[in-house]
């Protein structure tokens, strides 16, 4: 399978299908540090990133925000002292789409730059 971090998001329409269990088994190994959670009956990808201080956490938050704006796909972001929690899901379909796995992989790449 193509590296998720090099892929582009596609426009997600309300009638788009959520990823299947088979697709999750195929995609999740590329973003192994992301947990699949369920909140308000909606499956999401979530990861907590650790940093040495608030300034580093805020810098990562801003980079994640810029990435989201560029892709037109936006996560929930919680910035705290020394950590940032990023949660991806597709609002229009109330669940996980391939775009969420792509954006999780791209978010991971921010740590490498």
Swiss-Prot record:
Top EC class, one word: lyase
A Pfam family matched in the record: Pterin_4a
Keyword Amino-acid biosynthesis annotated: no
Catalytic reaction annotation: (4aS,6R)-4a-hydroxy-L-erythro-5,6,7,8-tetrahydrobiopterin = (6R)-L-erythro-6,7-dihydrobiopterin + H2O
Single Gene Ontology BP annotation: tetrahydrobiopterin biosynthetic process
One GO MF term attached to the UniProt entry: 4-alpha-hydroxytetrahydrobiopterin dehydratase activity
Family per similarity comment: Belongs to the pterin-4-alpha-carbinolamine dehydratase family.
InterPro entries: PCD_sf, Pterin-4-alpha-carb_dehyd, Pterin_deHydtase
Protein name: Putative pterin-4-alpha-carbinolamine dehydratase
Keywords: Lyase
Species annotation: Nitrosococcus oceani (strain ATCC 19707 / BCRC 17464 / JCM 30415 / NCIMB 11848 / C-107)
EC number of this enzyme: 4.2.1.96
Disulfide links within the chain: none
């Amino acid at each position: 399978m193509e590296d998720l971090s090099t892929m582009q998001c596609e426009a997600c329409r309300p009638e788009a299908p959520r990823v299947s269990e088979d697709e999750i088994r195929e995609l999740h190994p590329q973003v192994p540090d992301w947990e699949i959670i369920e909140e308000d009956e909606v499956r999401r990808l979530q990861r907590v990133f650790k940093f040495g201080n608030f300034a580093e956490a805020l810098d990562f938050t801003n980079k994640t925000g810029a990435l989201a704006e560029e892709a037109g796909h936006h996560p929930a972001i919680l910035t705290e002292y020394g950590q940032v929690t990023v949660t991806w899901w597709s609002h229009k379909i109330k669940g996980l789409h391939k775009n969420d796995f792509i954006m999780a992989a791209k978010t991971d790449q921010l740590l490498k730059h």
